[in-house]
Structures are given as structure tokens and as C-alpha cells.
Amino acid sequence: RELFGVIGLGYVGLPLALTFAEAGVGVLGFDIDDAKVERLGAGKSYIRQIPDSRIAAAVAAGGLAATTDYDRLSEVGAVAICVPTPLDGHRQPDLSYVMATAREIAARLRPGQLVILESTTYPGTTREELLPVLEGGSGLEVGRDFQLAFSPEREDPGNKHFNTRTIPKVLGGVTDDCLRAALEWYEPVFDRVVPVSGPEVAELTKIFENTFRGVNIALVNELKILCLKMGIDVYEVIEAANTKPFGFMAFWPGPGLGGHCIPIDPFYLTYKAHEYEMSTRFIELAGEINSGMPRLVVERVGEALNSHEKPLKGSRVLVLGIAYKPDIDDMRESPAVPVIEGLLARGALVDYHDPYIPAMPPTRQTELRLESV
């Protein structure tokens, strides 16, 4: 069988590539990062929760190879796009990575190939943004010459109960033939594939999942603030409420949202809603509450020091953990970053300790350059 291509070998693309390879499908991965390609070729991982042994086994079996050369797209029968979809400086969707990748594919697209977008995005992206670039750049027609579908990534780094293969895979094709072609590739690999009527449904499914979580976290964060003022233990309240066997789902307060999905995805939905002259006030309010939590943490640190007759300015503060969740090395959108920046802005002397992140890597989020103590 033809190779399966994966463009973008990060926290989404690499697990997807390994899942196909371990199912017996040959995979050719593409990434612009020479260091990643070299490590994969040597059987080494660069993501903590993916051990070297998985990479080495896939490479040794001939099931996984990686390259920086887009001209090798001619070797694959299907290609999944797994590139970042961040927000720009104005908190608007940034599809530049997706569109740049689409142009690279379009210049090399051949009849019979399948293109699948896996990057999280707003409803309409596959049909309204990706499709015109692919058809215009290749001269081919979707559904006749090539196939196009959307299947949202649902990665949860560090989850010990679910992995890429066992998480149900939602899949929507631009045409019926597109869906059938995508199912032929995905059904032998994943435990369960959930076909839907089109890419818009699949796109909104992912956005809704993460908006649901973000809104509920905002609710419990607001409850946390109220409980602080009332002198009530919010954790005891949640634990007691969680004894109800129906109609309640526990969410827990925290210093803010982290990861690439939950802090970002609701803004993709509100952006699209504005096209329909609708203001998603509930979602936007949740975003305001969650984005304000790091400031609350800084204020609480200052209050704690004041209770011991110490000012925040000049005090040494140690931040324990800077990843966005436990036991991973991923600090994308981590609330630890604005917490550290807020403490520094008020004159604190800040260090951090994280066994999985020895030094803060360059990110779009911050210019901080600290090393773990």
C-alpha cells in the first residue's frame, strides 16, 4: 500500500505517524525542523511521553521515515496536515501555517491522493480556505481527481487511559467519495471512526468539545473566587457535589488554562460567529475569567507574603512546574508564564523548578529565558 504522509511532527503529528506505523502502514513524515528529522532518523524521541523505543521500533521496521523535502509528497497516497493553528497578536485565528502547507501540497498534488486536515480550526476552513488553494494550485478537482477531508486531532498528552488509536476519530469528507477514501485509510488504524456529514460538523465538534471544557473551568474558577471571599473551601464543595450520581460533572479551579487547545479554540468559534453577526457572550466571558486567573495567583502570593509582613518586591518566589499539566514537557499557553511575568513585574525574584523542562524554550507566548533550579 502507498505511504501515509504526516506534515508537522510535533505533539499531534508524531503520535499520529506512530499510530499508523504501528498499524502496519508505512509513514513518511515531513517537518521543517532539521533537528526533529535527524532525531527521528536516529530512532530518538523529542517528546517526553513518547519513548525512544517506540520511535526506534518503527524506524527499524521500515514503517517510519522523516524528511524536510516536500518534493517527496509524490511518494504518499494520503497526507495529514498537523501544523499549528495559533492566535495572532490580536487574538484572531492564525491559519498561516495551514495555508502555507496547503500551497506546498497544491504544487505537488497528483490524482488519487487524499488530503486530511487534522489541525484544530473553525467550521468552514477545509471547504472555504483549504479547498480553493488545493484546486487552484493543482488544477485538479476535489471528489474527482483528489479527495479532501477533516479529522480533528484529540490528543491528550500524558493521558494513561486513552491514546491516539483508542480515542474515537471523527471524520468528515467534502464529498461522499472523499469520506469513503478517508475511511479506507482510517478505519484499519483506529479502534473507532465516527463518520459525520461533512467537514464543518467535524470542525465544530472539536471546537465545541474544548469550548465546553473551557466554559466549565471558567464557572468553577469564578466559584473559587467567590469561595475565597466567603471563607468556604471550594474543593470540599466540588467533592460533595460530585457525590451526586447524575447531572453533575466535576471541574476543578486552577491558575488558568494551558495547552494548545482549550485556551485557543473558543476564540476560533467566536471569530466565526461574528461572520453571522452573533456575539458569543457566554464563551467570551469564560475567556475573560480564565485569562484573569494568573493575575489572581500573583495577588494571592502578594497577600500571603503580606500576612508575614513581607513585600512581594524583593522576595524570592519559586514556581513549581511550568508545563500546562502534570508530568509532561509541554508548556504551550501555560498559565505559569503569565504568573512568572506578573511576579517579575512586581519586583519579585523568581525561579522555577520543573524536572521535565530544564530550560524555558523559545515560544510565541513569551521572551522569558529561565532555567530550572
Per-segment meaning from a language model:
Residues 1-373:
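Structural/interface elements that position substrates and couple domains in central-metabolism enzymes
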